Amino acid sequence: MPNAVPSATVVKTPLFRPSFWSITVFVLVASGIGIRAYRDLSRPDAWDYWKDQYIAPSMTVSLIDKTYLAGRDQGRRTLAVSGTIGPAASRLLRDRVDEAKLTAGDLILLSSPGGELNQGAIMGEIIRSHGLATAVGTADASGRIKPAYCASACVLVYAGGKPRFGVLGSALGVHRFVTEKPMKDPVADAQRVTGAVLGYMTKMGVSSSVVEAMSETREIRWLAPKDALAMNLITDPLSKP
């Protein structure tokens, strides 16, 4: 009887066998990410920025296909911006403007009590660089704009628009900007902030009288439409002030 043919031995080869170098590279990459995250969070106010950007944004930005500023308006694409201007607000606005592919003449619709001064100025610069218009208000389901208010740092965002529409019933509020952080020389710091705001407003084509109005009070001063128009803060009123 012929000898039985021995069955072949099947050797299972692992799909992947990590090498020393692959493990080393992984550890280095992981540690690099961890170190970078630690460095980011160890900076002053870094946690506030991360929280505002990734965990609980203080501001919402929504795309509206068309809003209508007045009866004869043909409608324009709009980003509705509402809420407090937090540490990551300018990053959020920049991302949303890019995602929406807004073009010159499209609208940024604002409704905000204010917030971070530097973020408000950066947001205004973003708006100006894209040639976007601004208005204060909220939009209903039909795209009709309803009155709202824009105060403090929000006014800097509004100033970035070209043109800046004045919606009947909406309000612009200004006050003296102060910092909550302890300063060695509060007077010098106040002068520095005032100078920076004046330079920004001048660049945006707003009269220096708006900064004078800001300097008069720490409480919100709501500008009458005729005053906002005289300051060139409002450039295109939708009704006679």
Predicted regions and their residues:
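A short, well-ordered alpha-helical element
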Residues: 85-106
